[in-house]
Amino acid sequence: MSFNHQDIEKKWQGYWEENKTFRTPDETEKPKFYALDMFPYPSGAGLHVGHPEGYTATDILSRMKRMQGYKVLHPMGWDAFGLPAEQYALDTGNSPAEFTEHNINTFRNQIKSLGFSYDWDREVNTTDPNYYKWTQWIFLKLFEKGLAYVDEVPVNWCPALGTVLANEEIIDGKSERGGHPVERRPMRQWMLKITAYGDRLLEDLDELDWPESLKDMQRNWIGRSEGAEVHFNIDGTDEKFTVFTTRPDTLFGATYCVLAPEHALVAEITTAEQKEAVEAYINAVKMKSDLERTELAKEKTGVFTGAYAVNPVNGEKLPIWIADYVLATYGTGAVMAVPAHDERDYEFASVFNLPMKEVVKGGDITKEVYTGDGAHVNSAFLDGLNKEEAIAKMIEWLEVTSAGNQKVTYRLRDWLFSRQRYWGEPIPVIHWEDGTMTAVKEEELPLVLPKTENIRPSGTGESPLANIDEWVNVVDPETGKKGRRETNTMPQWAGSCWYYLRYIDPNNSEALVDPEKVKQWLPVDIYIGGAEHAVLHLLYARFWHKVLYDIGVVPTKEPFQQLFNQGMILGENNEKMSKSKGNVVNPDDIVASHGADTLRLYEMFMGPLDASIAWSENGLDGARRFLDRVWRLFVQDNGELSEKITDAPNKELEKAYHQTVKKVTEDYAELRFNTAISQMMVFINDAYKAETLPKEYVEGFVKMIAPVAPHIGEELWSKLGYNETITYASWPIFDESKLVEDEVEIVVQVMGKVRAKLTMSKDASKEEMEQLALEAIQDQIEGKTVRKVIVVPGKLVNVVAN
């Protein structure tokens, strides 16, 4: 008889909730374990089967650690600000807050139905004013430290929608919603100076237990480069511009310069003859995103300004072009071009027939660019030097002549932190009529997002908050000075940068987190989530954590000690699950048909946790069949415990049991859940063959399967006669001595060829081995004379006979 998953799951979920079984203990004597999931955005679509994969992994670890005597922090919450709720509100006229609350309730119910051991008393919601009070508080600290500042930044402006769009909301230069044209225009934006932390963000990666591929993604994003800044005067004017180059040794090979179309000098230096062409090009570029502009494969475009720069090292005049592959927001917005020795410059020079000059020997620049090392030529005082020597000598020359200086730069840009949206955290700053600005006082936080019917974009580029006069307009009670609140809101990243800290102390109204509690719980021991957040979310969270470390709020330099990216669950056809393809599997349906334990077991058994694997109904059915086999082995049709279960030991199962405890314990700890489950299947096969089942082994097995299939685990535990939950029962321990093989397989050879294999005691003497071997190959050596018998104890017997 199989078990009734609906009854069992309902029963134990009710028990856990009523008894607050998974409440986090704050006592200090136990070792701690903090298992964190990337909290979900509560979308209208609800949970899909991809979510529970990571959640089940952290849940297995949390449940095992509790049984191993750890105090465990395993929380859940909601990353609930963001664009979809705002779009829904615009489309339906409902409030984004109501929509969000409804979605959170759906998500919470779905997650509870899967039996995860979360401490629901610690639930956080980024849209709760009691939560975002502290998001705003962190902003004030960034502002005080000079890490939050206002700047003019080119943004994606969509005139038809009257709003600024993120890069992700644009497809082929048009808005994703409605297909309206998008242009680049400068706007006043809040920026966070993440670049000030570039070196620390890079260096501290070495101390983390993260996948190397993920660390490399962060290293590349930060993109530290060493080189030099070089100053170029503009011929016939007092103006100059600066370029950064990693190859100052090739300065003698520069044949032209390129400025970003948005560069401040372009309008000033363009000649009358070139004005029309330059303006037309600038207007065309406004329609392109940074991503499109910097694609390596795209055809190079550009226009000559009519102006010339003077090469500081030899006085040569270099034509100044503008081209879209140079970004005003990246580096200095200007580059010196050495087409003989740089891939992009070579392509550009080839398109516009610009001169090339070889300054490093080793290639044939009439055929292709040469980027390797070699002796310098045509370079005056650098001639004959290799790359490293020439770079050092050129930097020395630049600094002595004040024509430049040594410089380290980062690919990392400061973080554009403002959004022209309603549904986000208000930025706690006031702009006064006299041009000054001040932060809202700490005691006035949270600055609550005002409720409004009108969340349509303002049309001016400001957020919809600009429409709410009674909220925006303020008067200083002391001076009578008039001011306007900041109308931009924070990006969705803000609330997710620090949520792992709030779980430690979710109801504290006096501080972001209690210093004693944070000391007790940090760093997070394991953080599991999708690889799509490998760069931005993790980089931003590490940045905020380091700022909080500098001001004494957190005791560790890094937030997440170990990180793991789960793979993706694909549709049965190996394609990504999506509504449009109609291949989305809803976990609610599986819980109803097969049970939560089956879903959990199946997702962990599909393959390695970091692999992307196709969903399979057959695999799901197989997982259910295994749980049914476990149930039938231990429980009779009448619901009583099987009569095979006895207090007496059973020698034949001893080794299999201890092997299973060892493998499951090690595999769970290393996140190899699929192989742990395989081992449990092997044990169940052995147990079916055994005459009797020692109660100790049955209890040990139930404890091992409970983290994967907790409802069945609890039900079997209660059938074994326990009134308490299995949650805090002690984890089984294996005996190393029981794993040692008593018997070994011996190979028997005649004249070096294998003729038989024998099983015998591992302690058999040479004489016993020889005797048993000769008996086994009697027919092979009949009529031959045995010349010699070579015995290797525990392994092999080789008979020489002719």
Swiss-Prot record:
<keyword id="KW-0547">Nucleotide-binding</keyword>
<dbReference type="Pfam" id="PF08264">
    <property type="entry name" value="Anticodon_1"/>
</dbReference>
<comment type="similarity">
    <text>Belongs to the class-I aminoacyl-tRNA synthetase family.</text>
</comment>
<dbReference type="Pfam" id="PF00133">
    <property type="entry name" value="tRNA-synt_1"/>
</dbReference>
<protein>
    <recommendedName>
        <fullName>Leucine--tRNA ligase</fullName>
        <ecNumber>6.1.1.4</ecNumber>
    </recommendedName>
</protein>
<dbReference type="InterPro" id="IPR002300">
    <property type="entry name" value="aa-tRNA-synth_Ia"/>
</dbReference>
<dbReference type="InterPro" id="IPR001412">
    <property type="entry name" value="aa-tRNA-synth_I_CS"/>
</dbReference>
<dbReference type="GO" id="GO:0005829">
    <property type="term" value="C:cytosol"/>
</dbReference>
<dbReference type="GO" id="GO:0006429">
    <property type="term" value="P:leucyl-tRNA aminoacylation"/>
</dbReference>
<dbReference type="InterPro" id="IPR025709">
    <property type="entry name" value="Leu_tRNA-synth_edit"/>
</dbReference>
<keyword id="KW-0648">Protein biosynthesis</keyword>
<feature type="short sequence motif" description="'KMSKS' region">
    <location>
        <begin position="576"/>
        <end position="580"/>
    </location>
</feature>
<keyword id="KW-0030">Aminoacyl-tRNA synthetase</keyword>
<dbReference type="InterPro" id="IPR009080">
    <property type="entry name" value="tRNAsynth_Ia_anticodon-bd"/>
</dbReference>
<dbReference type="Pfam" id="PF09334">
    <property type="entry name" value="tRNA-synt_1g"/>
</dbReference>
<dbReference type="Pfam" id="PF13603">
    <property type="entry name" value="tRNA-synt_1_2"/>
</dbReference>
<dbReference type="InterPro" id="IPR002302">
    <property type="entry name" value="Leu-tRNA-ligase"/>
</dbReference>
<keyword id="KW-0963">Cytoplasm</keyword>
<dbReference type="GO" id="GO:0005524">
    <property type="term" value="F:ATP binding"/>
</dbReference>
<dbReference type="InterPro" id="IPR015413">
    <property type="entry name" value="Methionyl/Leucyl_tRNA_Synth"/>
</dbReference>
<dbReference type="GO" id="GO:0002161">
    <property type="term" value="F:aminoacyl-tRNA deacylase activity"/>
</dbReference>
<keyword id="KW-0067">ATP-binding</keyword>
<dbReference type="InterPro" id="IPR014729">
    <property type="entry name" value="Rossmann-like_a/b/a_fold"/>
</dbReference>
<feature type="short sequence motif" description="'HIGH' region">
    <location>
        <begin position="40"/>
        <end position="51"/>
    </location>
</feature>
<dbReference type="InterPro" id="IPR009008">
    <property type="entry name" value="Val/Leu/Ile-tRNA-synth_edit"/>
</dbReference>
<dbReference type="GO" id="GO:0004823">
    <property type="term" value="F:leucine-tRNA ligase activity"/>
</dbReference>
<dbReference type="InterPro" id="IPR013155">
    <property type="entry name" value="M/V/L/I-tRNA-synth_anticd-bd"/>
</dbReference>
<feature type="binding site">
    <location>
        <position position="579"/>
    </location>
    <ligand>
        <name>ATP</name>
    </ligand>
</feature>
<keyword id="KW-0436">Ligase</keyword>
